[in-house]
Amino acid sequence: MRVSVWYGLLHAAAWTRAVSLQVSEDSDEQWTVALRDSRPIPGGSPLSRCDLDEDHLLDVQEIEITPNPPHRGKNLTVEARGDLFGPVEDGAYVTVEVRLGYIKLLSETFDLCKELEENDLGLQCPLEEGEYELSKTVEIPQQVPPGRYHVVARAYTVDDEPITCLTGDVYFPPLMPAERSRMPRLIDPRRMRRLMDPRRKPRIMDEGSGAAA
């Protein structure tokens, strides 16, 4: 159903915001559970269902993406279908977490009904139960840095009832010389190499001041 919204978040909103590189402590138990407790969604996309021990309102039956795998600076078309077993009303929300390796780049909560309207899907809350088939095209930002990105998106009703949990793992290869010359210098390459060094311990950011502890 609204899988295209989350996939848009995973690729457009999440990775665009990820270039700010807000590094935080890697101690999220919920993240570990999502990675271990997951099952691939039919269709060949990198997305899997997660939190399999919970009852979800949305049964995502299939997701197909073109191109597969995604490419930076290119459009990505997502086709999805699924069954919604209960209503979704105003106040529903989705949490999105993005990591580059073990580094947390983004952890944010979005208004699900607002995202539905702004993503031009022809849907608005309240949503009734039923079967949905959707197609959505989003743009993958050119400035996505190379690396393996892990994403977890969890959606909930206004009463905190689980709607769905999706997790994805997408790899963007190193930039070719011609691509580097066209890429905006939003991130210092030397800093990126340091951040991606597996020997490096993540810094813990002080939430009050924004400085490293």
From Swiss-Prot:
The keyword Oxidoreductase does not apply. Residues 1-18 form the signal peptide. GO terms for biological process: intracellular sterol transport; sterol transport. GO terms for molecular function: phosphatidylcholine binding; phosphatidylinositol binding; phosphatidylserine binding; sterol binding. Keywords: Lipid transport, Signal, Transport. Residues 19-37 form a propeptide. Monomer. Belongs to the NPC2 family. This is Phosphatidylglycerol/phosphatidylinositol transfer protein. It comes from Eremothecium gossypii (strain ATCC 10895 / CBS 109.51 / FGSC 9923 / NRRL Y-1056). The lineage of its organism: Eukaryota, Fungi, Dikarya, Ascomycota, Saccharomycotina. The gene is NPC2.
